[in-house]
UniProtKB/Swiss-Prot annotation:
GO terms for biological process: UMP salvage; uracil salvage. InterPro entries: PRibTrfase_dom, PRTase-like, Upp_A, Ura_phspho_trans. Uracil binds at residues 203, 208-210. Catalyzes the conversion of uracil and 5-phospho-alpha-D-ribose 1-diphosphate (PRPP) to UMP and diphosphate. It comes from Saccharolobus islandicus (strain M.16.4 / Kamchatka #3) (Sulfolobus islandicus). 5-phospho-alpha-D-ribose 1-diphosphate binds at residues 80, 105, 140-148, 209. Belongs to the UPRTase family. This is Uracil phosphoribosyltransferase. Its EC number is 2.4.2.9. One of its GO terms (molecular function) is uracil phosphoribosyltransferase activity. GTP binds at residues 30-34. Allosterically activated by GTP.
Length: 216
């Protein structure tokens, strides 16, 4: 399964600041932007490229790489927590077209939230996805039960893009397995895999509610 855990010293340093309850709102958002940019560069390493030849100012010719798929990127922002993450991704993919999806979990009465939650999409604005051409990147900082992501994937998979990437900061073991079991062709990029979900569907140890911490 194409699971990429980008657990390098720098990404883990930034993740530690995100987890810290004392990190303020401004720095929380800035750190999401930083990780979005780093994860974007990691994704770029998996895109299709061509070997090209260029001439330097000294008149010498040398071979290099042209990542052709940099022109074929669609980034989908799952509101609202993904906004800073997408800001970082756009620094890595400045030519990307953007889409937005608003999704919400159906509230459940009771103390315990089921892992298979109903999700409804209340807003959707996605650019045309060119079949077998575009690489779609779906951004959501936290993949807990994966219910929201699976709902969004239903929309994206129908368009038959060339590749589908998911970018998250923290994925639960349950959520990652659920996504990749259903869609084994998807590329999931995350900084870490956390082992648990609590009875409200939050990741443990996690970092709290990313949307609330980023925007209040």
């Amino acid at each position: 399964m194409p699971l990429y855990v980008i657990d390098k010293p720098l990404t883990l340093h930034i993740l530690t600041q995100l987890r810290d309850k004392n990190t303020d709102q401004i720095n929380f958002r800035k750190n999401l932007v930083r990780l979005g940019r780093i994860l974007g560069y990691e994704i770029a390493n998996t895109l299709d490229y061509e070997i090209v030849e260029v001439e330097t100012p000294l008149g010498a010719r040398t071979k290099g790489i042209d990542i052709t798929d940099l022109n074929n990127i669609v980034i989908i922002n799952i509101l609202r927590a993904a906004v800073p993450l997408v800001e970082g991704l756009l620094k890595a993919f400045p030519k990307a077209r953007q889409g937005v999806i608003g999704a919400s979990r159906v509230e459940v009465d009771g103390k315990e939230v089921p892992k298979d939650m109903d999700v409804y999409i209340y807003y959707k604005k996605i650019p045309n996805i060119r079949a077998k051409v575009d690489n779609v990147i779906i951004a959501d900082p936290m993949i807990a039960t994966a219910s929201t992501m699976l709902k969004v994937l239903e929309e994206v998979v129908r368009a038959s893009p060339k590749r589908i990437y998911i970018v998250s900061i923290i994925s639960s073991e349950y959520g990652a397995n659920k996504i990749l079991s259903k869609y084994p062709f998807i590329y999931l990029f995350t900084v870490t895999i956390d082992p648990e979900l609590n009875n409200k569907g939050y990741i443990l140890p996690g970092l709290g509610d990313a949307g609330d911490r980023a925007f209040g």
